[in-house]
Amino acid sequence: MAQQEKNWDTSYEWKIILLLSITFGLVGLDRFVLPIILQSPNSTMAKDLGLTPQDGGTLAGYLGMAWGISAFVMGYLADRVGRRAVLVPAILVFSLMSAASGMVGSLMGLVFVRVIMGISEGPVASTGVAVAVEASKAERRGLNNGIFQCMISLFGLALAPLIATRLLENHSWKTVFMLVGAPGVIVAIIMWFVVREPLKRADTGHGGGGGPFLSMFAHRNAKVAPLTLICAMGGIFVIAALLTAYLTAPVGAGLGLDPVTAGNVFSAVGIGGCIGQFAMPALSDIIGRKISTLASYILAAVFLYFFTQAGPDNTTTLWILLFFASMFNFAALAILAGPVAAEAAPPGMLASMAGFVIFAGEFVGGGISPIIAGRIAGGEHGLKGALYFAASGLVVGFVVALFLKETAPRKLRA
C-alpha cells in the first residue's frame, strides 16, 4: 500500500469492513438457508419439487465446486479489471439467484440456479479478501478479515435457522427465498460508490512466458496454504453435511436425539464458528499466523474426537465440545483464507491468491470430502466413522501447516 501510516484512512477501512460483513452475512444466509427450508416441516419445497435429502447434498456439492472455481478465476480477473467490476455484479447476481431459487419448478432448474449462485459467490470471497486487505492497516489484517468472515457462520449457521423458520410460519418457501435475496441488491449499489481500486494492478502479461501467473506461487505459503485449507474445509463441510444425521440417528448408529434437541446442539456450530473466525485471526496479528493455525487444527481435532466419544445423556457436554471443535476449525479456515493467503501474494495479485487458496479448499474440502464421508457413513464404519474421517483430516492439516512460513507483520518486525 502506498499510503503512509500517518495518513491512513481509518474511516474508509471501517466502512469497507462493515459493508463486507453485511455482504458475507448475506452470502452465508443465501448458501445455508436452502437445507433449512428443504427440511422444515412448515415448508412444502421437497414435496413441490420432488426432492430427497440426497438431492440436498447434491445441490450443496455443485454450489461448493462452482464457488471454488469461480473464486480463483474471477479473483484473477479482479486483479486485472478492478475490484468493483467483479465484486458489484457478483453481489447482484447471487442476490437475484437466491430470489430465483423460489421460482424454479424442478430439481434441474434448482441445480442450475444454485450453480450460478456458486459462480457469483466465489468472487465475493476472493475479491472481498483483497478489498479488505487493501483497506486494512497491516497490524489489523487478521482482525478485519476475521470480522467479516465470521458473518458467514453467524448468519448462515446461527441466524439462518431462526430467520427461515420464522418466515415459513407466515410465508411460502418461494416468498422466503425472494425476501432473503432482496438486501443484496441494496448492498451492491452502495459497494459501487464506496470501494476504491488498488493503486497497483497485476501485470497483464505482455512480457510473455506466463511469468505473472507463475509468480503467484513463488512464496512457500502459496503452495502450503491451499493444501492445508483443504483439511479445514473438509472438517467443516463433513460436519455440516452429516451432523444432523448423527445427532438424530438411533442409538448405536448415532445419538438418538429428538429434532428440537438436535437443533439446539447443532447451534454450537454456528456460534462457535463465528467466534473462532473472529477471535483467532485477530490473535494471529499478535502471536503469528503459523502458531495460531497449528493450535487451531490440533484443538479442533481433539474436541471433535471427544465429541464422538460423548453420549446422548448430557446435551450440555455435547454442545460445549461441538462449540470448541467448530470454533477452532473455523479459526483455521479464516486465518488461511484471509491473512495467510493475502500475505503470500505478489504485488497486484491479492485476489488471485485468495481465490486460488479458496478454490482448493472449496473444491476438494467442500466438494469431494463430504462425498467420501458419505461413503464412509453408508458403510460398516457408519456416521461416527465419517466424523473420525473429519478429525483425521484436521490432524493432516496440522502436519501440513508445520511447513507454513510466518508472515504476520508484527512478528516479522520483532
Residue ranges and their predicted role:
Residues A2-T10, L199-P226:
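Juxtamembrane intracellular "pre-TM" segments in multi-pass secondary transporters
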Residues P35, Q39, R220-Q277, L333, ...:
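Extracytoplasmic gate region of multi-pass secondary transporters
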Residues I69-L107, S284-I287:
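Conserved MFS/SLC helix-loop-helix module at the cytosolic interface between two early adjacent transmembrane helices
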Residues V111-S153:
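Cytoplasmic helix-loop-helix junction between adjacent transmembrane helices
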Residues G142-P161, L168, I358-S369:
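Glycine-rich segments within core transmembrane alpha-helices of 12-TM secondary carriers
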Residues A182-D203, V400-K405:
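C-terminal membrane-cytosol helix-exit motif in multi-pass small-molecule transporters
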Residues K290-P339:
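C-terminal transmembrane helical hairpin of 12-TM major facilitator-type secondary transporters
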Residues P347-G379:
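A late C-terminal transmembrane helix in Major Facilitator Superfamily
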